[in-house]
Amino acid sequence: MENGAVQQLQLLGKRVKGFGVGGRYVAHPYYSGRFRELLGCTPFPGTLNFDANLDWRELASMCEPQVIPGTVWDGVRLGAVYVWKAKIMTRHGYVDCAVIRPLLSGHPPTVLEIVACEKLEPILENNPDKTVIVTIACKRGDALRWRRY
């Protein structure tokens, strides 16, 4: 692989319920500006959570993330977030998104979150098993790897 070449990592996971707080963080000025730069839009104030059956640390070792560093904002600690530019399969084709892992997350290490320009739930395939297909753009790693739930 050429130095700096973009490779793809495809994850196949299952949607899971979140804690209901993702929207508050995505809409926070500290994070929303970073997501706006990455996605080219104001992100929908919420996340779609999925169990990738892959520990986020393993993902980070295969595909180097961008990092939004932690900070203190008006006396409140905001944790660092790992971010991967990606696309999610919807009934309309692939949609640009960001796969994220907040480092202060209370989710199991295999649960990742997706941030996008629009609410994803209505445009995902109506499949009873709640499958999610995400393709992450990597700057290093193998050409294509599959992780199945």
Swiss-Prot record:
Transmembrane segments: none annotated. The keyword Kinase applies. Keywords: Flavoprotein, FMN, Kinase, Magnesium, Metal-binding, Nucleotide-binding, Transferase. Pathway: Cofactor biosynthesis; FMN biosynthesis; FMN from riboflavin (CTP route): step 1/1. GO terms for molecular function: magnesium ion binding; nucleotide binding; riboflavin kinase activity. Its EC number is 2.7.1.161. It comes from the Archaea. CDP binds at residues 18-23, 118-121. Binds 1 Mg(2+) ion per subunit. GO terms for biological process: FMN biosynthetic process; riboflavin biosynthetic process. Gene3D superfamilies: Riboflavin kinase-like (2.40.30.30). Its cofactor is Mg(2+). Mg(2+) binds at residues 47, 49. InterPro entries: RibK_CTP-dep, Riboflavin_kinase_archaeal, Riboflavin_kinase_CTP-dep, Riboflavin_kinase_dom_sf. It holds the Pfam family CTP-dep_RFKase. It catalyses: riboflavin + CTP = CDP + FMN + H(+). FMN binds at residues 105, 113. Belongs to the archaeal riboflavin kinase family. Catalyzes the CTP-dependent phosphorylation of riboflavin (vitamin B2) to form flavin mononucleotide (FMN). This is Riboflavin kinase. It comes from Hyperthermus butylicus (strain DSM 5456 / JCM 9403 / PLM1-5). The lineage of its organism: Archaea, Thermoproteota, Thermoprotei, Desulfurococcales, Pyrodictiaceae.
